[in-house]
């Protein structure tokens, strides 16, 4: 399996196996640095953590200051080490500061 590492844009938070609060802190840090819009991305089992991250930022830390701009869902074909292909669900949630 060959992996090509593509650089992640500076306004993207990739959600994975860490605790949800790590991703909340990353999102809050980006917003406090002056980034007006950030994208929370996840796939597979981490999708629920991505949704939790957005909801915690929106409701607990920055109520009435953040809005969900766009939600994109899809799937990716992933090839395992033994050559089998499977589909993995993906989500991208774009949030931004209210004007």
From Swiss-Prot:
Keyword ATP-binding in record: no
GO biological process: chromosome condensation
Subcellular location, principal: cytoplasm
Annotated GO CC locations: chromosome; cytoplasm
Annotated Gene3D superfamilies: Alba-like domain
Intracellular or extracellular location(s): Cytoplasm; Chromosome
GO molecular function, one term: double-stranded DNA binding
Entry keyword annotation includes Acetylation: yes
Modification comment: Acetylated. Acetylation at Lys-17 decreases DNA-binding affinity.
Keywords associated with the record: Acetylation, Chromosome, Cytoplasm, DNA condensation, DNA-binding
Pfam family, one: Alba
Record-listed N6-acetyllysine modification sites: 17
Function, in words: Binds double-stranded DNA tightly but without sequence specificity. Involved in DNA compaction.
NCBIfam families: DNA-binding protein Alba, PRK04015.1
Protein's name according to its UniProt entry: DNA/RNA-binding protein Alba 1
């Amino acid at each position: 399996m060959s992996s090509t590492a593509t650089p992640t844009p500076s306004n993207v938070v990739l959600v994975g196996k860490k605790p949800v609060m790590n991703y909340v802190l990353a999102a809050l840090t980006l917003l406090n640095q002056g980034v007006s819009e950030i994208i929370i991305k996840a796939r597979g089992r981490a999708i629920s953590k991505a949704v939790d991250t957005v909801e915690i930022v929106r409701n607990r830390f920055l109520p009435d200051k953040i809005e969900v701009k766009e939600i994109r869902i899809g799937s990716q074909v992933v090839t395992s080490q033994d050559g089998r292909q499977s589909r993995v669900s993906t989500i991208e949630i774009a949030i931004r500061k209210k004007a």
